[in-house]
Amino acid sequence: LLTVRSGHLSLVIDKENWSMRYERDGELLTKSGWRDLSYLKTDWKGFAYDKGSEDAYMRQQLGLSVDELVYGLGERFTPFVKNGQSVEIWNEDGGTSTEQSYKNIPFYLTNRGYGVFVNHPEKVEFEVATEQVTKVGFSVKGESLDYFVINGPKMKDVLKRYTDLTGKPSLPAQWTFGLWLSTSFTTDYDEKTVMSFIDGMFERGIPLSVFHFDCCWMREFHWTDFIWDERVFPDPEGMLRRIKEKGVKICVWINSYIGQESALFEEGMQKGYFLKRANGDVWQWDMWQPGLAIVDFTNPEATKWYQSKLKMLLDMGFKTDFGERIPTDAVYYNGADPVKMHNYYTYLYNKAVYEVLEQERGKEEAILFARSATAGGQKFPVHWGGDCWSDYESMEESLRGGLSLTSSGFGFWSHDI
């Protein structure tokens, strides 16, 4: 036997059959038996035809004890206890009524007082007491697998150690914990409409901390150019001043997609600030608006360029929407694997915006209203639960998502009503 120790945690390896036991002060936490750590080929035709790592996967199965319950794996709107669920760690824009998630975190913890973090940015597939009801399985494509087993002994100790590894959020300012009011899907509004919303809250005795302008503060199909639509907001500076005089903070909707009609598109294209196709063309699609491009945050100059546009709006906070629909066939400035970047892109996006606020306003006042996330994204608070319906069933879904996310290392979370 080979024993590796770290504090109260030990890994005991049987060198004959490569089974493993994870123990805390001699007590078994979880184990990997014979063939639980596997190298799998999905289309193997024999040694003569083997093509190396193509269609290869690494899989690990770790044992569950009697009555052991699994939590976490990001913001999931499915049942809070994850036993019996198949989970894909792959960011999608699926709302709160599906098994998809905006914030996929390859980390789970159990009521036995330990956690497991699979250290891969790409897709990780979990089988939580499904393929075998006494095991949690997880697999990644390729020929290597990197994961951490994190000791407690209490569940909150697991989260502390996990965030020691991946980062901790700062404490948001007190005003951020108040009620936020949004234009949401109201697409035809002007200053008069906005003021009627705000005044209507005060007239009803409802305290209001933040007013949020959703996408239509900019001209339609010009998302994102960071320019107020002068047709309905001819005096944005004056309007913002009048809102602040009421003691209300301001948040505006942004994303990292630049539509072809945006004033920024030509500049970004000429300077190489967008994701590209293999032939060197700008990667574009029509999912949100015609011909949109996506800012390449692996390019330091593109990041500075995007941040410079935000600095013009620094009297406001930012709702960093989207960040999930990231292509897997794009070419990045730094040569990054686009499959691994699909989930990780949102980290760079939110980091770029948060850094501007932190530099200009200080850590105490830096605040996002972000929808997408990956492991480590908790360092850029705060996150919200995405698109939901205004009914009790959807509230239940959202609350399950928030509980799962805060079981995955995120300290702050909000949701729509």
What are these regions (language model features)?
Residues 2-174, 182-185, 191-192, 196-203:
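Catalytic and substrate-binding clefts that recognize carbohydrates or anionic sugar/phosphate headgroups
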Residues 32, 207-417:
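Aromatic- and carboxylate-enriched substrate-binding clefts and catalytic-loop regions
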Residues 47-52, 89, 99, 188-198, ...:
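Short, charged low-complexity intrinsically disordered segments located at boundaries
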Residues 170-184, 281-294:
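N-terminal small/glycine-rich loop or linker at the start of catalytic domains
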